[in-house]
Amino acid sequence: MKKLFCIIALAGIALTAWSQKPLRLSTYNGTSVERYDGQQCDVTADRYLFTGWNTISLPFAMTEQELDEALGQGVKLERLVGVTQQGNEIVLNFQDCKAEGIKANQPYILYYPGETSSKKFSANAQVVNKESKMTLTTSGGVEVTMSGAAFKTDGKGLYGILAINNVDANFTYIDNEKGFFYATRCYISIPGEQQFTLTPRHWAAGEVTSINDIAAANDIIDVYNVLGVRVAHNIKAGDVNNLDPNIYIVKGRKILVK
């Protein structure tokens, strides 16, 4: 009986060790993580980062502390929370979310203040095998999708942050056959033939509030987009949350509709 117990115990230890075995992700061609889905692993991804704004999407989560340890406390992490259109220009509203850490398969922009070099992203975390993608729609009906590349992806017809144009996180349209995105990078896609100018705006975590903090539900208000264009007139404050996800201006305050 004791021998049987020991065998079972050793099997359990071996299973635990296997479930947490090292997993190194390719940040060039990409790595299939399907067979690791839901498993706790010691995951590592060596990413080349440029000084300035980069993009990142990982199939595992990292805490704020782990991010600071990997890149330094000056790093910034932002997620897309809204899109605002005026003619051919689309404003990409990014909000600071570093306190939340990196969530698995969430597309982000990341500001790296250090020297251009390869950096190690690592964590003992659950691997998640799912598509990294989010879609927001402008008031003009244009769908803007930000996606993370799990594998090396053809870039023609997509928008991305180029190393030569990353001071302000500008997403540039790629119109040649030689453009591509390496794994763990992010890109933006917009359906149709029309090319847009994408302008990033960065919002601090505490710079944006909710409508409940500035108005009672039955208060009658006007709502403006971040370009100063009125998008709703004489509506109840409680109805603001029915608007498309974005950042709006109400009574001079910035509010976030999720």
Language-model features, listed with the residues they occupy:
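Sec-dependent signal peptide recognition
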Residues: K2-I8
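Eukaryotic membrane transport/trafficking proteins
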Residues: I90-F94
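Hydrophobic h-region of N-terminal signal peptides that target proteins for export
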Residues: I8-W18
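Solvent-exposed beta-hairpin/edge-strand motifs
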Residues: E64-Q85
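Generic secondary-structure boundary signal with a strong preference for alpha-helix termini
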Residues: A14, E64, D239-V240
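A short, polar beta-strand/turn micro-motif
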Residues: Q20-L71, Q95-I211, L256-K258
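C-terminal outer-membrane/trafficking sorting elements
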Residues: V81-T84, E207-K258
